[in-house]
Amino acid sequence: MGLTHALGAKMVSRGTGGIINLASNSAFQPLPHMATYAAAKAFVLHFSEALEFELRGRGVQVMAVCPGPTATSFFEGVSTEMKDGAFDRAELVVRRTLRSFDQKKSVAYPGRFSVHVAIWLPRLLPRNVVVSAAASATGKMGLATPRKRRG
């Protein structure tokens, strides 16, 4: 955020520039066992959308990008094996992101169809269903911490 403000101010004074902030499809749903990550990505999305509005007409383009699972080192160390086909190639995500930026979009969703479903479906379902499904998914990745028993 500090870097965006510092460089954004210089871009405004020059009357030109562009900012792409990396959010995630996780910005659209609560993720038990990854709560801080999902909340941070929601912040990045909302920060970027608000900043895009504030800087509109001042020569600085702002876009948030919300990819899904991408073939990077992010998932190293999870205790379950992730299917190879479950990830978008990083090159594809970058290419689609830059195309969206060229098209002057304020938010980009560069992933496959399942990423679009993961972004839009939680807006339609009851929240308890969304949280339960997300908890199941993060638990299967080995991210769940055992609950302490009351006794």
For each predicted feature, which ranges?
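C-terminal helical subdomain
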Residues: 64, 81-119
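A short helix-coil junction within the Rossmann-fold of NAD(P)-dependent oxidoreductases
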Residues: 6-15
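Active-site loop immediately N-terminal to the catalytic Tyr-X3-Lys motif
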Residues: 31-35
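Residue(s) in the substrate-gating loop at a strand-loop-helix junction
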Residues: 24
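Short, flexible catalytic-loop segment of classical short-chain dehydrogenase/reductase
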Residues: 67-77, 81
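Active-site-adjacent segment of SDR/Rossmann-fold oxidoreductases
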Residues: 10-11, 29, 50-61
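Hydrophobic structural elements of the Rossmann-like NAD(P)H-binding subdomain
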Residues: 20, 62-65, 75
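Active-site helix of classical SDR
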Residues: 4, 40
